[in-house]
Amino acid sequence: MSDKLLYTLARPFLFAIDPEAAHNLTLPALRRAAAMGLTSSIVKPAHDPRTVMGITFPNPVGLAAGLDKDGAYIDGLATLGFGSIEVGTVTPRAQPGNPMPRMFRLPKANAIINRMGFNNGGADAFVANVRSSKFYQNKEGVLGLNIGKNADTPIERAVDDYLICLEKVYPYASYVTVNISSPNTKNLRQLQGASELDALLSQLKEAQQRLSDQHKRYVPIALKIAPDMELEQIQTIAQALLRHKMDGVIATNTTVSREAVKGLKYAEETGGLSGAPVFEASNTVIRALKSELGDALPIIGVGGILSGNDAQAKIAAGASLVQLYTGLIYRGPALVKECAAALHA
């Protein structure tokens, strides 16, 4: 049975239950299926290597952070054909996130609203999960580790949390993503301001250089940014990335705008909106970044990819790689192969 047919059969059941409950059923089931060899029939994308941030990605279609916050399902996700897997966001200490319900489907818009709030088991448990994965142990592919700050850490001390996480995850990452753009942690997006960003990037770069010397291995750092910005702020961020010699930028996170989903059930729920409604906003940010960065810094495009054509549009806007999340929920794992085929050089 093809992965497309299997997901077509499973989706009505998954969509009949709470989104977070469906998530909590699907990932353990995938892990068990992978352990039993049941995912071996999934046809993987053609080898289509891209070198980005000094890393060779086997194909340009990655998994975005957020699906596997604790790095507990890496081996199962690795069977779906991604060119990279990004897990997290992880914070220094475990935290429960926001109260439930905190995830809502908007199927008429191919969208999701979430206000999860960086729920995770903390950096030590995260690292233990990563280290125990066969994907990491056997160096099977590209693994991105996404870091954030605890909800109860004052925004003035946010840098401390990022430095703690960077120190812990650095030895195990192919690259590290610094998430300063979730709308679900109070004041987090303030870190995208000019002075706050300068202070953060300066200390991250200093720590990266020290850790590179310590571990005899350079691990690139990418910054994940929001779609809800004016051109001037995007330009300011791009200039800061160049000034501090960062390695990449991921555009974009979820949006707080509700323009595209007005009138739909759950549209007024607080949180970040992902899926089709963020597609154009993300592309606008990517184009603005590309205009500022040129070829000096690579862009990873994420936001609203639900087809191979969508993936092509991200690359046309200026991205070097793409990532999926919400599209997987609506289209299933067949989307990975479809996007990879559309981007095959």
Swiss-Prot record:
Its membrane topology, per UniProt? Answer: Peripheral membrane protein
Q: Which residues form the signal peptide?
A: none
The coenzyme or cofactor needed here is: FMN
A molecular function GO annotation: dihydroorotate dehydrogenase (quinone) activity
How is the cofactor bound, in the record's words?
Answer: Binds 1 FMN per subunit.
Q: How does it assemble?
A: Monomer.
Q: Which family does it belong to?
A: Belongs to the dihydroorotate dehydrogenase family. Type 2 subfamily.
List the protein's name.
Dihydroorotate dehydrogenase (quinone)
State the organism of origin. Answer: Janthinobacterium sp. (strain Marseille)
